[in-house]
Amino acid sequence: MVNVCICGGGSQGHISAGVIGSNPNYNVNVLTRRPEQWAHDFKSIDLEGKEYRAHIDIITDNAADIIPKCDIVLVCLPGYANVSFLETIKEYLSPTTYLGGVFGGSGFFLAVQKVLGHNVPCFALQRVPFTGRPLEYGHSARLKGYKPYLKVGMMNIPDSERIVNFLKVVY
């Protein structure tokens, strides 16, 4: 079981929680400023009406509660928020935790290097993997469209196939 932390309660965080959490090989957790508004039983619905049902294990606003337990930390925040967010999780990241960004085109790698240094294993998508919106905040999301393909950049990841396989499965 791979432990994933979805960081952020916006559109990408909502959709990712449902889609990734619906896969039985992934245990999903959410780090958000509004944990009291999230439910442990969550779903994302795509354009054809397919439901991705997920159980969110830990929902918190405290990075210390979840970041040390995760194999992959997926940052679903707008680019301007990356530096301050990375400052809040810095002390809890393990050297073996993979840090990912869904908004890579907004300077994700630069923010990682500025805050965490040059040795952090990280990856970032060039563009967001899909479009959508929360239906009921913290409970459900509507997936409105998929990207036909994804481009990903990686830094300090010796087993890149692991990340490629993760992205193929979840997106």
Residue ranges and their predicted role:
Residues E36-D41, G107-A111, R162:
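Short, charged/polar "capping" segments at the starts of alpha-helices
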Residues H55-K69:
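Short acidic low-complexity segments
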Residues T32-R34, A63, F103, Q126, ...:
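Residues at the C-termini of beta-strands that transition into short coil/loop
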